[in-house]
């Protein structure tokens, strides 16, 4: 299995997100202004040259600027010594149905964290669907708030991880 990761391939990421979040899971609002921001990093994963999954990471302040009603990440102990612009949000992690059960989501999560760290992140926060919390816990993320229903009524929880070695 030859795995390749790329950044900047929004059209491929959009295809995965449309299939997984809109067609499969029924979300109505999948794309936003964040997708168009130059500081938003779209990560795509390919297996043997075939599109398999995606994610995006971006500076936290971008979310507030794009949507005043977006869920707000809660403060946590990991925020200590993290300046404005050094907290990134990871989201839209998805793997196409035919490519699942191969550990690819873990690869995407790890690659996304590396991209955020390379862009200056010290802390990554994410608002994960409840059923995938174990995936992120295995990758070192800690739940920092109870489950909520702020994202189209679906159960999600905030998680965070320091990526600066602290």
Q: Positions of the model-derived regions?
A:
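Short loop/turn motifs at secondary-structure junctions and domain boundaries
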Residues: 33-37
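Conserved catalytic-core motifs of GNAT/GCN5-like acyltransferases
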Residues: 125-127, 142-158
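A short beta-loop-alpha structural element at the N-terminal edge
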Residues: 1-13
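Helix-loop element at the rim of GNAT/NAT acetyltransferase active sites that forms part
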Residues: 15-29
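Conserved GNAT acetyl-CoA-binding A-motif
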Residues: 109, 116-129
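Conserved active-site tyrosine of GNAT-family acetyltransferases
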Residues: 17, 136, 141
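Conserved beta-strand in the GNAT
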Residues: 44, 50-60, 65-80, 87-94
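Conserved acetyl-CoA-binding loop-helix of GNAT-fold acetyltransferases
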Residues: 95, 101-114
